[in-house]
Regions:
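Residues within the helices of the helix-turn-helix
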Residues: 22, 33, 47, 62, ...
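Structured, helix-rich domain cores that form ligand/interaction pockets
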Residues: 2-16, 23, 27, 66-345, ...
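Short alpha-helical DNA-recognition segment
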Residues: 29-48
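Short alpha-helical segments used as structural interaction elements across diverse proteins
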Residues: 21-22, 40, 45, 58
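Short, basic-rich loop-to-helix N-cap that marks the start of a DNA-contacting helix
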Residues: 53-66
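Residues in the recognition helix of alpha-helical DNA-binding motifs
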Residues: 24, 38, 49, 350, ...
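Alpha-solenoid HEAT/Armadillo repeat architecture
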Residues: 26, 51-54
């Protein structure tokens, strides 16, 4: 694998290899810090390698190439953490924020209410930490989709990976309550209406006894984060069980939310593995044992479901895998890698709300002012006062990621 980069079929010498490697890294749009975290080395060491200040061994070439290929934008499948919920058996919320999340609590907003019967919480963006005086409840960390992406920006600045964080959480006694693994299909290898039809035709061999499907635009009767734009959706398994799958058209969601034409969407479909309690714990244990996201994800999928083609002259247990499904689970395709998509906390949702709900009224008032000279906005601003929460958000938005994180 260390001779992966070639010119005219000739293996490169070290200088050429380093240049070709650095060019490929830039082509993939990967920073040195991000790649170093994935490879398990320091950014400074990677910088010295790319500048030719230290020799690069064959072993290091393999390690760097494996790390870099995890960011290959042409990979047909990628996987992300899309939901993480962990309960810690402690009432010391400061310890969890400081030592496990490694964030500075002074930049987090405190609210005297919570969810899941917790009584208060701290949050920054979509990263929520709940607490309660009830020792049995302890402290609860919740990262939904956006929270995972935002937390990845902090992990990157901390030079930590998801594996590092999960290990820290479990060592500290963390109890997995939920884990969602999202497999993104970038090429359309999954056909959700076809999978739904196979479920109806008994071409879905599964230990699950139920499935539900919804057409594009149909109300998804479940507590989904993005239920308004999920497109064709198929649930395999009971939503009340500790493991079930949700497969939906991500391209439709991107069209509804961002206006991206369906045919141009970078992600066509998404296959989500949703795990709770003991199932979530065993998945994390497997991830931390093998550091192989594909192994963990597809061992779960293959344990619970497979799609086949009906063969009239054979028993159902002997029907062959559907070609499209076989490709999805690993036959003749590039390996799936655990990737990250760090996104800083922004005011995008607030700005979109202002644009839809507030700005038309502001524009109306400005027009009236221009025609009559009566400045309603100026009068309103005189009595407007910012709350402590507003000042905290200002602080969050004007502070660098490096200042929000804590070094262990």
């Amino acid at each position: 694998m260390s001779q992966f980069f070639r010119k005219g079929g000739i293996a490169l010498n070290d200088t050429e290899w380093i240049q070709d490697f650095a060019d490929r890294r830039l082509q993939y749009g990967v920073s040195q810090t991000k790649l170093a975290v994935m490879a398990g080395i320091s950014r400074e060491h990677l910088s010295r390698i790319e500048s030719g200040k230290v020799a690069v061994t064959e072993e290091m070439k393999v390690k760097l190439l494996e790390a870099l290929e995890k960011f290959n934008p042409e990979a047909p499948l990628t996987m992300l953490f899309d939901y993480v919920r962990i309960r810690f058996p402690t009432l010391d919320i400061g310890h969890i924020i400081k030592d496990i999340l490694q964030l500075n609590i002074q930049y987090m907003i405190h609210e005297d209410f919570g969810h899941y019967s917790y009584t208060e919480h701290y949050y920054i963006g979509d990263i929520f930490v709940y607490t309660s005086p009830d020792e049995e409840k302890g402290v609860l960390l919740e990262l939904k989709g956006k929270g995972c992406r935002q937390f990845e920006s902090y992990l990157l600045a901390q030079e930590r990976s998801w594996y590092d964080f999960l290990m820290d959480a479990l060592v500290d006694g963390g109890v997995m309550k939920r884990l969602d693994l999202a497999i993104n299909d970038h090429t359309g290898m999954l056909d959700i209406p076809e999978l739904t039809e196979k479920c109806r035709n008994e071409e879905c061999v599964s230990v699950f006894r139920s499935f539900k499907s919804y057409a594009s635009g149909e109300l998804v009767k479940h507590e989904e984060q993005d239920k308004a734009g999920m497109g064709y959706t198929l649930y395999i398994g009971s939503l009340k069980s500790e493991v079930y799958f949700c497969v939906y058209e991500k391209s439709y969601e991107q069209y509804i939310k961002l206006g991206i034409p369906i045919e141009e969407a970078p992600i066509k479909n998404r296959f989500e593995i949703r795990l709770k309690n003991e199932r979530a714990y065993y998945a994390v244990r497997d991830l931390l044992t093998y550091y192989d996201a594909e192994r963990t994800a597809f061992s779960i999928i293959n344990r619970y479901v497979r799609f086949v083609d009906k063969e009239a002259d054979k028993k159902r247990s002997d029907w062959k895998l559907s070609v499209r499904w076989a490709w999805f689970i690993g036959e003749n395709r590039e390996p799936l890698k655990l990737t990250t998509k760090p996104e800083p906390y922004t005011l995008d949702r607030t700005l979109r709300w202002i644009q839809r709900q507030v700005d038309p009224t502001l524009k109306m008032l400005e027009t009236i002012t221009a025609k009559t000279g009566v400045d309603y906005l100026k009068e309103i601003r005189k009595s407007t006062k910012l709350t402590e929460k507003h000042y905290k958000i200002i602080e969050q938005q004007t502070t660098s990621t490096e200042d929000v994180i804590l070094e262990k």
